[in-house]
């Protein structure tokens, strides 16, 4: 029984680490992923080793499977809380909606406005890049000002230049100034 509990606990530690490592690889953060992979591998070997010692012990196998499933739930929760990376939203509007553009820019979001031809009229598309950690804030602003907007989103693997890069550099400089002032 104690072995089954140990296997379960190891799995709910191992699987979230596996999730984080996978995300780091997808985000092209290979060095961080390799570091996390060391811990992941060690836990995996210990847990699986206990299970393979006695394959007739069904409690250990069940603990492994339930721990894996629970670890997936926990890993998904942790990934959402960490919100690593950036996201782009494309927002389609019937009118230019300067109020929305101004509010997004005032809130620190980079916004590019495009005019295009829809089936019945001119349409406007906003391209908005944001940190994933600010996605909820972004959606609240859009839904408050343009609740009928059509939106689609996708995650960004990498980017270069633009407003967001300038804003990040500016924040880094401000942080250094604050550290030197203290």
From Swiss-Prot:
Chief location bin: membrane
Highest taxon of source: Bacteria
Localisation per UniProt entry: Cell membrane
Disulfide bonds: none
UniProt entry keywords in alphabetical sequence: Cell membrane, Membrane, Transmembrane, Transmembrane helix
Any single GO CC term annotated in Swiss-Prot or TrEMBL for this entry: plasma membrane
Transmembrane portions of the chain: 6-26, 32-52, 58-78
Membrane topology (UniProt): Multi-pass membrane protein
Pfam families recorded: DUF2179 (PF10035), DUF5698 (PF18955)
InterPro entries named in the record: DUF2179 (IPR019264), DUF5698 (IPR044035), UPF0316 (IPR022930)
Xref: HAMAP family: UPF0316
Similarity annotation: Belongs to the UPF0316 family.
Name of the featured protein: UPF0316 protein BCG9842_B1857
């Amino acid at each position: 029984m104690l072995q089954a509990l140990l296997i379960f606990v190891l799995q709910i530690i191992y699987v979230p680490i596996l999730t984080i490592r996978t995300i780091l690889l997808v985000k092209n953060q290979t060095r961080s992923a390799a570091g996390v992979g060391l811990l992941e591998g060690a836990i995996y070997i210990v847990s699986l080793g206990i299970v393979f010692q006695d394959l007739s012990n069904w409690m250990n196998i069940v603990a492994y499977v339930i721990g894996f499933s629970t670890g997936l739930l926990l890993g998904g929760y942790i990934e959402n809380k960490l919100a690593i990376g950036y996201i782009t939203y494309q927002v389609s509007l019937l009118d230019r909606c300067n109020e929305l553009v101004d509010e997004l820019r005032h809130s620190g979001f980079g916004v590019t406005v495009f005019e295009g031809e829809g089936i019945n009229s001119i349409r406007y598309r906003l391209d908005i890049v944001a940190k994933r950690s600010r996605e909820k804030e972004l959606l609240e602003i859009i839904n408050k000002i343009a609740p009928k907007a059509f939106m689609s989103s996708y995650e960004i693997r990498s980017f270069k230049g633009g407003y967001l890069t300038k804003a990040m550099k500016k924040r880094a400089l401000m942080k250094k100034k604050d550290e030197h002032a203290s």
